[in-house]
């Protein structure tokens, strides 16, 4: 028993913690930051003000995490984020393909709790910052009301992943809030501040469920009345449907005309008013009798935020960087979501709930956007990085932010290792150290190759048991109507295009138009360049056609063989799935403002182009055709090019389908001491792994090698893995293997998918 008498006053418990890296904010950005820093040997304290990790992706808000893939509704092929956020997404898919937000919470908690070197403080709110001097943060002070504890957390380095930039703000860093003028950064899409507004608002979502019996609903007094008059989108089936819930109600947005930090409680109450009012309309207007058995299962208790402070960094990313896809010497991350701005009146605005304009491909984000010029031991990540309001419309999404989290966690861990400042990596030579470290963990930076002098692969002779020759896709016996223009997308080397043969059906005599296209901008996937056009007269029934193009292809690149829409034509289908090749369609995806093509108003600095996007499995099928001669688009030599996904080519080795024991052998003239092997597999970087609600048809990507073993020169098994589903496998040998040869034996995933590998690292 603990019994205490009266005293004049008491203080709550106080704990002091000293660490290397302090990460403030436990959203996806903060989680990736903390994990990356800890894996590189730094002691980390992760301070999160909520009871769970994940931020807007958590069960408290329930927004799906997305990034460059944009629901697979843009031209960013193979663009899903790599590195730690890829680990999170593939783990969630494996455990939780149905998209339960509560399960996603556990995925994040598991990863952080089982990572040595991280101290996690949940329900802990930072409220003040201490400084050693004008340019150096010494500590933060935080309070946990649940355990009545005050924490004084001292660190060498600080990462502000708080969403609102609280630590940067308290430390005195410069920031912006709202929109720049058009002339400030030559941004044609910068909004009219008075008419459109200059801040994005908050959102609260809700879930419903069918109880199987009638459920009445009595709305709270604060619920919005006369919803049809106040919310025009109720009359627009693109937005409102009684079958929608969760993320489909992203347009329930409010607060863009207010202070999205200090007015957040008022904004939340207004959003509750709207949510409960909409549910009252659904249940009690008498217009939807089919909803009699439905009840509210969940309503968000905190709003999901889109925008508040943006810190001023050494570089400010802007609209032109995104649309023109500028190259930066210090590129460390990338984006690909559309520039997505919302009217500040939010749910009460008339007209569209958002204005999305896409770039033709992914764009680089420079390191200089993650640090400022005033605090030497501070970096910032997430939606608060140094961008304009317009650029923030793209960079703010969670998977893009998470990429940046890994960047700043890695940078601060390297600072800790080398006893330097984050600004030191702005140097053109030093930035290569950071870029190399990021790439070695599977992090993707468009246009960069991993070059590591310490990698024993550099001096190895690489041989394969066989090599897959791409000669097209086998027919599965089924046909599908050519309702939309459809293209086979695959890479070719310089030289003459191979002939393409296929069997198509026609319901009546008609003409099939075939266009050979490519991306004018280089290594993109927007087929805006017409190379050659063919026309084929089809008779009713079966037609065997052979397409022979005259054009010489000048360089290694991706090409599109486009079969233009004709509803009288049936195209042959295939179940084959071959890495770095796919089938794309010129169709509509309203979820990301994809109407088949993009035609922006004149003068806003956005390009017009068509969208050619894949379908999702299981609906997605490749076009069955035969190539002659077959293409040599896979090679064991690609193991050395340092690119771990399709970019300009497959960048992969794939074994022949007839190979009963696909293997890759690395040989050295003398014995090597090998302590670590990293293998980089194909987990279909084209598939958007939305974390919640949508659900997926697979828990493991069908391209991924599940089972493999590694042997030395004597045939001794050094490692055996069964049931793999991850992109990067890191194998540690203790004691180290001493051998002059390593063989990696893969089992092909299925009869439709050859065994494939992107890259090998040997340490």
Please give the residue ranges for each predicted region.
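Short beta-strands within extracellular/lumenal beta-sheet-rich domains
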Residues: 475-491, 544-545, 651-670
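PGST-rich, cysteine-poor low-complexity/disordered linker and tail segments that act as flexible spacers
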Residues: 581-657, 664
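Aromatic, loop-rich ligand-recognition surfaces of beta-strand-rich domains
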Residues: 503-504, 509-524, 579, 645-717, ...
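Flavin (FAD/FMN)-binding glycine-rich loop and adjacent Rossmann-like elements that form
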Residues: 12, 56, 134, 139, ...
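Beta1/beta-strand and adjacent pyrophosphate-binding region of the FAD-binding site
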Residues: 15-27
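Conserved N-terminal/central alpha/beta ligand/cofactor-binding core
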Residues: 2, 8-10, 18, 36, ...
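N-terminal Rossmann-fold NAD(P) dinucleotide-binding loop
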Residues: 30
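Noncatalytic modules at the cell exterior or secretory-pathway interfaces
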Residues: 550-567, 735-747
């Amino acid at each position: 028993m603990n019994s205490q008498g009266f005293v004049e006053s008491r203080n709550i418990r106080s704990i002091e913690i000293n660490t290397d890296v302090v990460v403030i904010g436990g959203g996806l950005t903060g989680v990736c930051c903390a994990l990356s820093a800890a894996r590189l040997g730094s002691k980390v304290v992760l301070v999160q003000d909520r009871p769970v990790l994940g931020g807007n992706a958590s069960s408290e808000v329930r927004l799906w995490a997305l990034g460059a893939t944009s629901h697979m509704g843009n031209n960013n092929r193979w663009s899903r984020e790599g590195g730690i956020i890829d680990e999170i997404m593939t783990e969630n898919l494996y455990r939780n393909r149905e998209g339960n937000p509560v399960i996603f919470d556990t995925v994040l908690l598991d990863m952080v709790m089982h990572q040595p070197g991280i101290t996690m403080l949940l329900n802990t709110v930072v409220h003040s910052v201490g400084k050693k001097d004008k340019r150096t943060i010494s500590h933060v002070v935080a309070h946990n009301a649940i355990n009545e504890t005050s924490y004084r957390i001292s660190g060498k380095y600080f990462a502000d992943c708080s969403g609102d930039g609280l630590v940067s703000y308290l430390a005195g860093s410069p920031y912006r809030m709202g929109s720049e003028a058009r002339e400030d950064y030559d941004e044609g899409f910068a909004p009219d501040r008075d008419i459109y507004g200059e801040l994005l608002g908050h959102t609260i979502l809700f879930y419903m469920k069918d109880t199987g019996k009638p459920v009445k609903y009595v709305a709270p007094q604060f619920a919005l009345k006369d919803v049809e008059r106040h919310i025009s989108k109720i009359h627009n089936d693109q937005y409102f449907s009684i079958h929608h819930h969760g993320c489909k109600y992203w347009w329930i947005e409010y607060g863009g005309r207010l202070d999205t930090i200090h007015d957040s409680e008022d904004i939340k109450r207004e959003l509750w008013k709207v949510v409960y009012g909409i549910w009252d309309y659904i249940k009690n207007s008498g217009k939807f009798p089919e909803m009699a058995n439905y009840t509210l299962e969940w309503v968000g208790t905190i709003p999901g935020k889109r925008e508040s402070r943006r810190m001023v960094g050494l570089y400010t990313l802007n609209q032109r960087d995104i649309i023109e896809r500028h190259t930066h010497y210090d590129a460390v991350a990338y984006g690909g979501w559309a520039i997505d701005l919302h009217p500040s009146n939010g749910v009460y605005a008339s007209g569209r709930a958002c204005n999305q304009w896409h770039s033709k491909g992914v764009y680089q984000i420079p390191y200089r956007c993650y640090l400022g010029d005033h605090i030497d031991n501070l970096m910032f990540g997430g939606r608060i990085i140094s961008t304009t309001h317009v650029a923030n419309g793209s960079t703010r999404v969670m998977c893009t932010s998470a990429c940046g989290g890994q960047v700043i966690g890695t940078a601060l861990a390297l600072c800790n290792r080398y006893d330097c400042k984050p600004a030191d990596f702005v140097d053109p030579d030093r930035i290569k150290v950071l870029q190399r470290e990021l790439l070695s963990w599977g992090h993707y930076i468009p246009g960069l190759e991993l070059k590591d002098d310490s990698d024993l692969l550099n001096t190895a002779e690489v041989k394969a048991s066989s090599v897959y020759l791409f000669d097209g896709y086998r027919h599965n016996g089924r046909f599908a109507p050519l309702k939309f223009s459809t293209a086979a997308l695959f890479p070719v080397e310089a030289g003459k295009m191979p002939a393409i043969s296929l069997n198509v059906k026609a319901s009546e005599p008609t003409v099939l138009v075939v266009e050979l296209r490519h991306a004018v901008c280089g290594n993109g996937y927007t087929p805006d360049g017409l190379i050659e056009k063919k026309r084929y007269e089809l008779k009713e029934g079966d037609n065997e056609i052979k397409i022979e193009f005259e054009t010489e292809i000048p360089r290694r690149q991706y090409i599109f063989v486009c079969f233009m829409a004709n509803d009288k034509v049936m195209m042959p289908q295939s179940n084959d799935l071959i890495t770095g090749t796919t089938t794309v369609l010129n169709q509509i995806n309203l979820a990301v403002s994809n109407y088949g093509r993009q035609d922006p108003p004149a003068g806003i600095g956005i390009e017009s182009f068509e969208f050619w996007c894949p379908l999702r499995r299981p609906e997605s099928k490749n076009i069955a055709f035969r190539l002659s001669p077959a293409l040599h688009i896979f090679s064991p030599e690609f193991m050395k090019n340092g690119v771990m996904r399709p970019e300009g080519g497959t960048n992969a080795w794939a074994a022949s389908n007839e190979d009963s024991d696909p293997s890759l052998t690395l040989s050295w003239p003398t014995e090597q001491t090998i302590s670590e092997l990293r293998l980089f597999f194909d987990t279909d970087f084209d598939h958007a792994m939305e974390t919640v609600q949508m659900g997926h048809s697979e828990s493991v990507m069908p391209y991924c090698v599940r089972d493999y073993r590694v042997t030395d020169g004597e045939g001794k098994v050094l490692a055996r893995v069964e049931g793999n589903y991850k992109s990067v496998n890191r194998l540690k040998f203790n004691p180290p293997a001493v051998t002059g040869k390593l063989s990696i034996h893969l089992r092909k995933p299925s009869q439709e998918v050859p065994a494939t590998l992107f890259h090998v690292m040997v340490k």
